Swiss-Prot record:
Subunit annotation: Homotetramer.
GO molecular function annotations of the record: GMP reductase activity; metal ion binding
Entry similarity comment: Belongs to the IMPDH/GMPR family. GuaC type 1 subfamily.
The encoding gene: guaC
Reactions this protein catalyses: IMP + NH4(+) + NADP(+) = GMP + NADPH + 2 H(+)
Top-rank EC class of the record's enzyme: oxidoreductase
CDD domains in alphabetical order: IMPDH (cd00381)
Sites where the protein binds NADP(+): 108-131, 216-239
Keyword NADP tagged: yes
EC id: 1.7.1.7
Entry keyword set: Metal-binding, NADP, Oxidoreductase, Potassium
UniProt organism field: Shewanella halifaxensis (strain HAW-EB4)
Pfam families noted in UniProt: IMPDH
Record protein name field: GMP reductase
Length: 347
């Protein structure tokens, strides 16, 4: 047993210090990034925000809507090959280039992934996702997928420390997904005592990834546009959002009427609800590590994504960053004990 004395920080522990700016308007800020990925050699440009691979968030409808904003969707892994076929055949390259194909790590997942990728040359992104990215099994699976699909852009996770980021990149991942337990419907930290404050995880993992020519996705913990900006400021190349994009007409969650109001079911992918739906219940040897909540129906996701991007543009103007790429260079975090004045309630 050992104790690390360094304080680790989450988004609520800091604010970004304003700096002089020559920008006259938020409209001058460019949120598009261009990346050339280490192993695949592929180049992608767009707004590096990703809808999380949850079946009550990342539906095909979500992918179609977010592609209009140059935003990515990690489409959840529970669609059948037939459903993927219908989607791919009905969409343009402009949509498909903003889609990530999600996969588990079983032999069946590998076969299904290969069948889906074969449907279109525009499907370039793979999201390999397991809750515990510290498993050697994940590293072996990344090697297997890289060997079978050398042209694909592979993201893998989830992890929270630089050593594992480096191992996954060396094994063949272009991008590493960072975050254990910060999500709004995740209870891993409560059930297991395991986790890492998300901002510190992003800062440390970005440093490790960038040293090897890789990228990271900050996955989880964002509850407002300011948190998204802090994630980018901390060095995240991409930011993945679940709860912030849940509850919309494109999210795919079950719609329920409660007391005359439209509500949408949203749940973690290790929750009782998810395991009842996809695995026939919670196995006897494990515990559910997610919540199920009802969110007020929020209409179209277009308004929400515009609000998020508007907030990040505003962050850039406050620190003098003309582009999202410059934001991390212009970011100085200050530790705080307060975030906002809630005398009239929260935003």
């Amino acid at each position: 047993m050992r104790i690390e004395q360094d304080l680790k920080l989450g988004f609520k522990d800091v604010l970004i210090r304003p700096k002089r700016s020559t920008l006259k308007s938020r409209s001058q800020v460019d949120l598009n990034r261009q990346f050339t990925f280490k192993h695949s050699g592929k180049t992608w440009s767009g707004v590096p925000i990703i809808a999380a691979n949850m079946d009550s968030v990342a539906s095909f409808k979500m992918a179609i809507s977010l592609a209009k904003h140059n935003v990515m969707t990690a489409v959840h892994k529970h669609y059948s090959v037939e459903q993927w076929g219908e989607f791919v055949s009905s969409q343009t390259a402009d949509v498909l280039k903003h889609v990530m194909v999600s996969s588990g790590t079983s032999d069946a997942d590998f076969i299904k992934l290969s069948e889906i990728l074969a449907m279109s040359e525009e499907l370039n992104f793979i999201c390999i996702d397991i809750a515990n990215g510290y498993s050697e099994h994940l590293v072996d699976y990344v090697r297997k997928v890289r060997q079978a699909h050398p042209q694909a852009v592979i993201s893998a996770g989830n992890v929270v420390t630089g050593d594992m980021v480096e191992e996954l990149i060396i094994a063949g991942a272009d991008i590493v997904k960072v975050g254990i337990g910060p999500g709004s419907v995740c209870t891993t930290r409560v059930k297991t005592g395991v986790g890492y404050p998300q901002l510190s995880a992003i800062i440390e993992c970005a440093d490790a990834a960038h040293g090897l020519g890789g990228q990271i996705i900050g996955d989880g913990g964002c509850s407002c546009a300011g948190d998204v900006a802090k994630a980018f400021g901390g060095g995240a190349d991409f930011v993945m959002l679940g709860g912030m994009l849940a509850g919309h007409e494109q999210s795919g969650g079950e719609v329920i009427e409660q007391d005359g109001k439209m509500m949408v079911k949203f749940y973690g992918m290790s929750s009782q609800s998810a395991m009842d739906k996809h695995s026939g219940g919670v196995a006897k040897y494990r515990a559910a590590e997610g919540k199920t909540v009802l969110l007020p129906f929020r209409g179209s996701v277009d308004n929400t994504i515009n609000d998020i991007m508007g907030g990040v543009r505003s962050t850039c103007t406050y620190v003098g960053a003309a582009s999202l790429k410059e934001l991390t260079k212009r970011t100085t975090f200050i530790r705080v004990q307060e975030q906002e004045n809630n005398v009239y309630g929260k935003e």
